[in-house]
C-alpha cells in the first residue's frame, strides 16, 4: 500500500464497520485532532468488540486535551480539531501479558505476584482478577503488587469474552486443565487476529488429546482429565498461542511449543521469564 500525503487531512464524517476490530475506530479517533475539520465516526455493523479499548482511546485523547463527544446510542464518536498539550504519563504495564504468568500458579500451585499492577485502570486486562477468581484462584493486592494463589483445582467457566478477547488463549489453556466444562462466548472477532485463534486453539488443544468444539463465535471446552499427552503445539506466528501452549506444557509432559520466539512481539524474553519461575 502506498500513501501519498498532501500535508493536511480535511476530515469530516465517515461511517465504517468496525465489528471485526475496534482498532479501525481507535486509529481514526487518534488522528482526529490533527484533521482540519476534526472527525465524526459512526459505526454501522455488528456488535463492536473490545469496547474497553475504545474507551481507553477516548480517555487518552481527553488526557491530552482533545475534545471528544461520544453518543453510545447512535454508535457515533466525534473528535474536534485542535492542538494537543503535552502531559507527563506513567505508562502502565500491559495487563493482558500477565495472563500466562498468573496461570502458572493456578496450574502448578503456589503463588505469583505481579508488581506494578494498577489499582485503578481502564485496561480490559484487569478483568483477569475476576475471571481467575471464578476459576478457583485467590487474588488480592499486597504491598508488592497483585498476588494470585492457586486453588485446589481449576474450575471451568461460562463467560462472554467479547470485550477481552486477547485473554482467550490463556483462558482456553486453563479450561483444558479444569475440573468441569467451559464455554467461552462472543469471540468471533478472534478469527481475524494474527491467526484464526478459535480454529487454532481447537486444533492444537485437540492435538494434545483435549476436547474442544468450535462454533462461529464460541469455544466449548470439555476437560479430558488425564488424557492429555505430549506433542507439538503450533503457534501460527501468534504470541498468545505460544503462551497458551506453554501453560498446558506445565503439566503435560513432552509438549513442544513450536516457534516460541514469536512471543518477542510482546514479551521479548518470555522463555527466560518463564524458566525463572519454574526453578
What spans do the regions from the language model cover?
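Short, structured segments at the rim of ligand-binding sites
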Residues: 1-279
Amino acid at each position: 500500500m502506498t500513501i501519498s500525503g498532501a500535508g493536511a487531512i480535511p476530515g469530516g464524517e465517515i461511517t465504517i464497520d468496525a465489528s471485526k476490530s475496534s482498532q479501525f475506530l481507535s486509529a481514526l479517533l487518534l488522528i482526529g485532532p490533527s484533521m482540519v475539520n476534526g472527525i465524526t465516526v459512526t459505526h454501522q455493523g455488528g456488535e463492536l468488540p473490545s469496547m474497553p479499548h475504545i474507551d481507553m482511546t477516548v480517555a487518552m485523547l481527553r488526557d491530552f486535551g482533545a475534545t471528544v463527544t461520544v453518543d453510545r446510542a447512535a454508535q457515533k464518536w466525534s473528535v474536534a480539531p485542535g492542538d494537543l498539550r503535552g502531559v507527563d504519563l506513567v505508562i502502565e504495564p500491559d495487563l493482558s501479558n500477565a495472563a500466562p504468568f498468573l496461570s502458572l500458579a493456578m496450574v502448578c500451585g503456589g503463588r505469583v505476584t505481579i508488581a506494578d499492577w494498577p489499582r485503578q485502570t481502564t485496561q480490559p486486562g484487569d478483568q483477569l482478577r475476576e475471571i481467575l477468581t471464578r476459576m478457583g484462584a485467590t487474588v488480592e493486592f499486597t504491598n508488592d503488587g497483585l498476588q494470585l494463589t492457586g486453588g485446589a483445582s481449576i474450575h471451568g467457566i461460562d463467560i462472554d469474552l467479547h470485550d477481552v478477547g486477547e485473554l482467550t488463549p490463556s483462558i482456553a489453556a486453563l479450561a483444558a486443565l479444569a475440573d468441569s466444562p467451559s464455554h467461552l462466548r462472543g469471540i468471533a472477532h478472534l478469527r481475524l487476529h494474527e491467526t484464526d485463534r478459535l480454529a487454532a486453539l481447537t486444533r492444537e488443544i485437540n492435538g494434545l488429546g483435549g476436547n474442544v468444539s468450535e462454533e462461529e463465535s464460541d469455544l466449548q471446552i470439555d476437560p479430558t482429565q488425564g488424557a492429555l499427552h505430549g506433542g507439538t503445539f503450533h503457534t501460527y506466528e501468534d504470541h498468545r498461542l505460544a503462551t497458551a501452549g506453554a501453560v498446558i506444557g506445565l503439566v503435560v509432559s513432552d509438549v513442544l511449543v513450536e516457534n516460541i520466539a514469536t512471543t518477542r512481539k510482546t514479551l521479548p524474553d518470555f522463555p527466560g521469564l518463564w524458566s525463572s519461575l519454574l526453578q
